[in-house]
Amino acid sequence: MKLIVWLGNPGKEYEKTRHNIWFMVVDDFLERWKMEACKEGKNWCNILETMIDNQKIIFLKPMEFMNRSWWAVSTIVNFYKIDPKDILVIHDDIDLIVGKIQLKLWWSSAGHNWLKNIIEKLWTKDFWRLRIGVDRPNHQDQVAEYVLHPFKKEEKNIIDDKINEIENHIKDFLSK
């Protein structure tokens, strides 16, 4: 069994923001892969259970703000008894240029409080992360505002050009 978690913030006002890049991308994949949309859960997550190549896959879309997403991840991991190495957490990263993609196992929180919380609740760093760069603002004090703003058109085009590469990374994780 594999768990794929994609993080963002709930609500219409955040739909097209940098923090929600994965809400946009993975929702698109589910449509491209002809999967039904995630079912609405108990207010704190949307979930889709499916089979791919005879393997159960759970897609989890926490419907809490980023800093509270650990609750949904921890609850689902404990309920299904999922091995951390079978978890892929997908998120944006300001330390990577727009469109740069990295898939890695065992990473630090890199200063992300929500990721630090997930590591604490799982008692391990030993899970997969797929990061996509959204770039960094010019000044550190602008980060919170920056990630809650939409991409510029040229940045969105860069992301759109990476869709197949992102899909291949997800398929690579599923084959591990």
PLM regions and their residue ranges:
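Nucleotide and nucleotide-moiety/phosphate-recognizing core
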Residues: 2-105, 116, 120, 126-130, ...
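Short, electropositive alpha-helical surface patch
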Residues: 140-160
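Short glycine-enriched, charge-decorated loop/helix-capping segments at active-site entrances
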Residues: 102-108, 147-151
